[in-house]
UniProtKB/Swiss-Prot annotation:
Disordered: annotated span: 1-32
Gene Ontology cellular component terms for the protein in this record: extracellular region
Identification of the protein by name: Apolipophorin-3
Known partners and oligomeric status: Equilibrium between a soluble monomer and a bound lipoprotein form. Apolipophorin-3 associates with lipophorin during lipid loading until each particle contains 9 or 14 molecules of apolipophorin-3.
Keyword entries, A-Z: Lipid transport, Secreted, Transport
UniProt-annotated location(s): Secreted
Biased composition (Polar residues): 20-32
Biological process according to GO: lipid transport
Tissue distribution of the protein: Hemolymph.
Function noted in UniProt: Assists in the loading of diacylglycerol, generated from triacylglycerol stores in the fat body through the action of adipokinetic hormone, into lipophorin, the hemolymph lipoprotein. It increases the lipid carrying capacity of lipophorin by covering the expanding hydrophobic surface resulting from diacylglycerol uptake. It thus plays a critical role in the transport of lipids during flight in several species of insects.
Disulfide bonds: none
Family listed: Belongs to the insect apolipophorin-3 family.
Keyword match Secreted: yes
Amino acid sequence: DAPSTTPPQDXEKKAAEFQKTFTEQXNQLANK
């Protein structure tokens, strides 16, 4: 379970940042 001190918006924000970083890294690997 997620901590009750973490708002759902914060989790969504971190998830979006993680997805963005993951996509950028994948693009770098694909471009090599």
